[in-house]
Each structure stands twice: as structure tokens, then as C-alpha cells.
Regions:
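Alpha/beta-hydrolase-fold catalytic nucleophile elbow
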Residues: 1-4, 78, 116
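Mobile cap/lid helix-loop segments that gate and shape the active-site cleft of serine hydrolases
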Residues: 2-66, 87, 91-95, 103-107
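Acidic catalytic loop of the alpha/beta-hydrolase fold
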Residues: 81-86, 120-122
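Short loop/turn segments at secondary-structure transitions that flank enzyme active sites
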Residues: 6, 76, 83
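Proline-centered helix-kink/hinge sites
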Residues: 55, 72-74
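Short, flexible active-site loops
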Residues: 50-52, 79-82
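C-terminal catalytic histidine-bearing segment of alpha/beta-hydrolase fold enzymes
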Residues: 96-143
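Short beta-strand/loop motif that positions the catalytic acidic residue
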Residues: 70, 77-79
Length: 143
């Protein structure tokens, strides 16, 4: 089953925290773009880089903007508390935005956030079990 962590690119840039681990996944592209601009890879450069490769990523299409759009449909968010690619502050910002949207839609029971202790950027047995239980609850045929 596919998983993707929730994050906030904008939070990482505003707090100068965590963008290094995320850009490491795009290391060759990041370094090539920095060389083209004769710039160091720093927070300001990374913001411009994100705007070049995915316009809107740090605002219109970031976690805090996108998660609320899923309401009122069922959504389970599972993140590790030690994921260097998804700093906890950004995760919490995205989750808080989703919680507000689900509450406003009268669908708070359709949103769940599971924060796994001591988990990094990985799919644990606990996450897999929680997802299966969630799928059974929300995707099973109704009588």
C-alpha cells in the first residue's frame, strides 16, 4: 500500500529547518541549479528552486493548503516524529489546518492523525496496521 508523509515546505523554509533533508532527495538537480545561478544552496536559494520546479509548492500546494481540501472525506495521516524530511513543526501545521477544515465540515471523526514515536522516514508495522484498520472502517461495503 502506498504511503506519503505529510509536510509543509513553507514551514521548513520559514523556520530554516528540515529543507536540507528534503532537497537531498533532489541533490543533483539542486546542485546543478545552484551552480547555474552561482549561488550557495541556502534557504533563499531553495525557495527559488522550489518555485522553478514546482510553482506554488510552498504556498498554494503545500500541506497546510491541500489537506483541508480533502475534507469531509476520510483521511488518515501517519508520520514519524523523527522524520528529517518532514519536520514535526510543519507536520503539525498541516494537521492543524486539516483538523480545522474537518471540524468546520462536521466531519472530525473522518480525520485521524497518528504520530509514531521514534519513527523516521519509514513505513512501520504500526503504520501499516493503522492504515489497514482505517481502510476497513472507511472503504468496506456498507450494508
Amino acid at each position: 500500500m502506498p504511503f506519503i508523509g505529510v509536510q509543509s515546505y513553507g514551514w521548513s523554509l520559514r523556520h530554516a529547518a528540515g529543507w536540507e533533508a528534503r532537497t537531498w532527495t533532489l541533490r543533483q538537480a539542486t546542485e546543478a541549479a545552484a551552480a547555474d545561478e552561482s549561488k550557495a544552496v541556502n534557504t533563499a536559494f531553495v525557495r527559488r528552486f522550489y518555485d522553478r520546479i514546482a510553482p506554488g509548492l510552498v504556498d498554494r500546494f503545500d500541506g497546510p493548503a491541500m489537506l483541508p481540501l480533502i475534507a469531509p472525506r476520510a483521511l488518515l495521516v501517519v508520520n514519524g516524529d523523527s522524520d528529517p524530511r518532514s519536520p514535526l513543526g510543519g507536520v503539525r501545521e498541516a494537521v492543524a489546518a486539516a483538523e480545522r477544515a474537518y471540524a468546520a465540515a462536521g466531519a472530525s471523526e473522518r480525520f485521524q492523525f497518528l504520530l509514531e514515536a521514534d519513527a523516521a522516514h519509514e513505513i512501520t508495522a504500526e503504520a501499516r496496521a493503522a492504515a489497514l484498520k482505517w481502510f476497513e472502517r472507511w472503504l468496506s461495503p456498507r450494508d
